[in-house]
Each structure stands twice: as C-alpha cells, then as structure tokens.
Amino acid sequence: MSDDQPGPRTEYKLETDSELRFEMENGNDKVTVTLLNGHAELYGTELVMKKPYEFGVGAKVAIFTYHGCTIELRGKPDVAYVARETPMVQYLNCNSALEHLRTKAEEDDVRGPVAMVVGPMDVGKSTLCRIFLNYAVRLGRRPIYVDLDVGQGGIAIPGTIGALLVERPAPVAEGFSQQAPLVYHFGHTNPSENDVFYDALITKLAETTLERLQANKRAKHSGMIINTCGWVKQGGYHHILHAAKEFEVNAIFVLDQERLYNELLRDVASKTVQVVYLPKSGGVVKRTRSQRAEARDNRIREYFYGSKMPLYPHSFDVKFSDVKIFKVGSPALPDSCLPLGMKKEDNFTKLVAVQPSMQLLHHILAVSFAESIEENVIQSNVAGFICVTDVNMEKEVLTILSPQPRPLPQTILLVSDLQFMDSH
C-alpha cells in the first residue's frame, strides 16, 4: 500500500509484554504495519523501525513487545486489538532453556537439543516452532527445522514432510527461506490415509537429518525443532511416540492439552526427555475445514506462482511414454491371499503403477530423485512438484505446470491426492 492510497491510520501504544493482534479475512484488502518507536517482533523476527510491512487476506498477526513500542496500522483489518495477556514470556523462558542446552552441547561437542512441539489442531504449533527458530538464529545458531505436518506442509507443499537448515530469521510477512529443503512425498493430508507409509517416512527423515546434524558442526550444536500434526489421539498419538523415538527427541513442548501432556509424562518422560506443558496464545484462531482447504490451495499456488515476489512457472507437454507414474500403497488383501513371506503392512508401502488417464487432471505429482524403480522410490526425496493441467488421450500427452522449464529432472512421478485448479 503506497502513501498516496487512502486507508485509515491507527496508532497503538503497546506497554511492556503486550501484543497487537489483528486478522484479515475479506476481499483484496491489505494492511500496512509500521513500528514508529521502541522494539517489537513478529514470532521472533524483529521489526525494523519506520519500515512498512504489508499483510494480505488470511493474515492472522500478533506483534509482540518486551519493552513497549508504538505501532501504526494502516488499512481496515477485520479485528485489531492490544492484548496484555500473552504466553510469550513463557515461550522465551523455554527458548532460554534450549539455548542453555546448546551452549552445553558446544562445550562437550555433542548434539544439541532435539525439541518437538505437539498439540491438537489450531493451538499455534507452527508459530511456536517459528519463534524458537528465529530466536536461535538471532543468537548465531543454525538449527534444523523439521515439519511432519502433512496437512499444511510448511516446508514444501501439503502432503509432504521435510527438513530445512535455518540460517536466517524468517522475513516478517513470509516463511523461512526455502533453499535446498529435504522433502519426502506422502501424497495425503492426513497420516491416517496410510499410517505405515507415514511412519516409514518419519524413520527415513529422522535418519537423514540426524546424519546431517553430525556432518555440520554448527547445526549439530544447534539441534532441531520439530513441528507435528494436530492429530493427537489413537493413531496420531502413536505417530508422536514414533517420531520422538526416531528423532531421539529430548524435549517435548505440549501446547494446550493436559491429557496429551500427562500421556507423554507417562510414556516418554525420563532423565533424557523433558516434557513441558505450555498454554496456547489467546490470539490463536480456530480454522474451519474450508479455511484449511483454502490455506492448502494457497500453499500450492505460492509454490508455482510465488507470494510477494512473483514466480513464472512453465507449461509444457510430456509424452506418456517419457514418464513412469506411480502411487504408494495398494488395497489391503486378506491374509489368505497374501503371497508367501509377505506381510499385510507391505501393501501400504508398495509402489503401484498408474496408467495416464483423465483421472490425473489437476493432480499434483511429485518428481522423485530416484533414477529407476530398482531404487527405493518411496524413501527417495523429491526434486519438486508439477501439476497436470491437461490430459490428451488421443495424442498420449500430459500438459503440466512446472516451476522449471523442460525437461523434467527425473522421470519417476508420484501421484498425490492433492489437486490444484490453475486459474492463471
């Protein structure tokens, strides 16, 4: 929003340990925030004095100050208010404890803390991860961020899990820099769609990231911050326990659910694993099913088209014969029909060939780094994603939307449940 555009201006004077919260729900409205004096931060990233920051539709923002500040808000948010009750000081105390563990790890030349954030949906898990990561980087650390939430896909797109070395704070209105993330294709937005495959991917991602920690001294001492899904009962709880074991987690922060906290105290807490209960922020907003679907769609749109800095994806044709398309998992067979020596679970991680058809239209396909199906395709990380925008059965050609020009870097493609209607 430029200075010559109309828009009501409101000044907010924030006292010590308070935050300005606002939400953007409607149309094409934008809000610009400027720090006029004092110090303030957004989820651990410091605001620069007198620099305007722009937020668009869907933004749910909480700007916090430890020492007091004045903020100018320009535009018409749906809701804007100052909150004096905030758990930020508790979050900072947890970060101080993590930093103490990192300093100790540096002195002893051992691995730094591996911390996992858990809790039900809409309690602020990814926000708390962002706060911990930003604070760590501001102190000169280089932690690895792991995202196991296939529902929102904070590192790549929904339907994936991944890891990223964080080297600088996230820009105020965007996420962390996406250079060279390690991403694995799951293909669904809920782990319950294929629990066996999801666990196998967690094991593979843990093995790879723990190896990477050992190989990079600065990252090794900095440790990891792990974000998880909001499914915390039954199968979801099993996945939390599995992730804690595979990543060799030594700190678990439980947001806003005492039942989960007590279960983890019973099943995980020990001399080597601390379990800490934290309240959620009052600024956390419950999302409807349609808001979640819209957020997923926006993540995929950003992947192809960018957000603040527009990207220009490529559209080109690929012959059916030039690619091999698979999905992971086949329908479960009764025990009596299984081949000798095969377990029922094996079906869930089986590679099943998919014949090109109109059913692929609008589907997201992951481009695997695997060069042949002799490799372990399901546990190979992915180079990126494409979207099928047209299927010509007569010419035997797929038209695809791709972030890179032709040719595709590899020819093994994995089908995702996710679809994207390209409206550009």
Curated annotation (Swiss-Prot):
What sections of the sequence does the record tag as coiled-coil? none
What Pfam families does the record point to?
Answer: Clp1, CLP1_N, CLP1_P
Can you quote a single GO CC term? mRNA cleavage factor complex
What InterPro entries does the record tag this protein with? Clp1 (IPR028606), Clp1/Grc3 (IPR045116), Clp1_C (IPR010655), Clp1_C_sf (IPR038238), Clp1_N (IPR032324), Clp1_N_sf (IPR038239), CLP1_P (IPR032319), P-loop_NTPase (IPR027417)
Q: Where in the cell is it found?
A: Nucleus
- Keywords attached to this entry: ATP-binding, mRNA processing, Nucleotide-binding, Nucleus
Signal peptide feature range: none
Principal subcellular localization: nucleus
Q: Where does ATP bind?
A: E19, K60, D122, V123, G124, K125, S126, T127
UniProt-recorded Gene Ontology molecular function terms:
ATP binding; polynucleotide 5'-hydroxyl-kinase activity
- Highest taxon in the source lineage: Eukaryota
Gene Ontology process terms (BP): mRNA 3'-end processing; tRNA splicing, via endonucleolytic cleavage and ligation
Indicate the family of this protein: Belongs to the Clp1 family. Clp1 subfamily.
Q: What job does the chain carry out?
A: Required for endonucleolytic cleavage during polyadenylation-dependent pre-mRNA 3'-end formation.
- Can you name this protein? Protein CLP1 homolog
Species of provenance: Aedes aegypti
